[in-house]
């Protein structure tokens, strides 16, 4: 045996311990797969490299879906949050999204502790430098310690570290995050295997010293009095998070009677705009130093003043990074300008005139693998047993990374034991939409999830994730029998009360309870006085019942549309079809179909540039292969 081979029997090896890697490792281990989690630094596991927050528009729903599939992000957020808010509370339930500010270090340490306690899982500090192949299969990894680890499957969750290059003005440093080294040699393994790589860019704002800020010149943004948590079940426990006498923090980290910490709002000024415009030539993004494309929906301050030149000012949020630190994150001030300009820019903002910068803003560009090279299971089409999740697939955000990591972990464990993969449909949740968009359409810029990307978003209210995904959790063994039983009890209660309200008339009133609820929802009637038996139910059950009744007509229409689309989704496309030889198929369509290699006719229909006549031709070809 090769003396460098440390272990030859892992089912799953995860490369990288960010938000995708942690969910991947936990999911695989919880399914019983022997799992190795490799990271360059055990002390930066699950680090919040950018803003110290989880959730938000569509992202909050994704976190709920992660919880419904047995993931950790929701629980970890509930246990380490310092502020909770429900976004879009004045709007309909379908677009309401939970969001939480987290204690950055507590989030990181609690998740590290959870990994350490998980059976079947070994977190190990080593940097992956290359992959080991046997033919068109991956069979292990090499590390900087001159050790090799062998495994049946490998998941790559390298974030921004693949040939990461940080920019502050004209200054460049190798690294995927300030203070951490980049993975310089791993990209060569992908290229060796024929996997295409491209470059993307992201950025982060400066961090400020809280005691140097003048909050009297800002607007306070408090947390909600009625807290909306992320996890569907009670997550409280009293195990010590830090095993030292000086701290009272528990693994819970938050309780109903504890004080939430406020965020603060302020605005840029004309002086801020002048500084940015006068120094654009010194910005790494505008001087030609950066090749990668940045995030459209999280633009740098340079982009804001260039792309939205008509706006006189831009909103900034001062977000606390934790209970045990005085550091603040300046949401909205991402930049790659030189440090001296950053400081002037910060001082031009009301309340920040005397701010002390603790860390500079910077941009980072990195390699990513265009995700059309993946199957919907997130396994590589070119290298068997190799899975990708997170920013390496071109996404942006902790939540987008985490849900991919969970799916990759489940599917790698399934592949190792010869089981079918977990595929979530577009009609089942934002996670399904995200993966389908990535593997079918690809992306040329950091992909962020929005409610508008989901055609069936009315079905994706944050409270319904358990009901939508429980059958997947049951099939793949992702939840305990007791929790699955609780979900079924909740489902039974919801269906019972929906039926009661729709079929029972209000004594002395007009129509049924359901009619009254719909009138109240549209503002055309006074609030409904619900029966006491209904009001003693959990808030989650009450909200789901009211939602289903309020939007009954719309939800029924969505279900009919899904039923129609289901027929085309069921038609499998043989993977041996040579699209270029299909007579009548346009050349553009043939090229795109050959790149994506869709698994179903439904997936083929969503490829950009493939039109209905192309789908009709494919139906004929598929029918002929079956004859």
Regions found by a protein language model. Give the residues of each.
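A glycine-rich dinucleotide-binding beta-alpha-beta segment and adjacent secondary-structure elements
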Residues: 302, 317, 323, 329-393, ...
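Conserved N-terminal/central alpha/beta ligand/cofactor-binding core
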Residues: 26-133, 145, 157-177, 181, ...
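Glycine-/small-residue-rich beta->alpha transition segments that form the dinucleotide
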Residues: 153, 158-162, 337, 350
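Beta1/beta-strand and adjacent pyrophosphate-binding region of the FAD-binding site
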Residues: 6-20
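Internal hydrophobic alpha-helix adjacent to the cofactor/substrate pocket in enzyme cavities
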Residues: 401-422
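Core beta-strand elements of the Rossmann-like FAD/NAD(P) dinucleotide-binding domain
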Residues: 8, 144-153
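Extended, charge-enriched "interface" segments that sit outside catalytic cores
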Residues: 453, 459-461, 465, 470-626
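An anion/pyrophosphate-binding glycine-rich loop and adjacent beta-alpha core
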Residues: 41, 188-343, 440-510
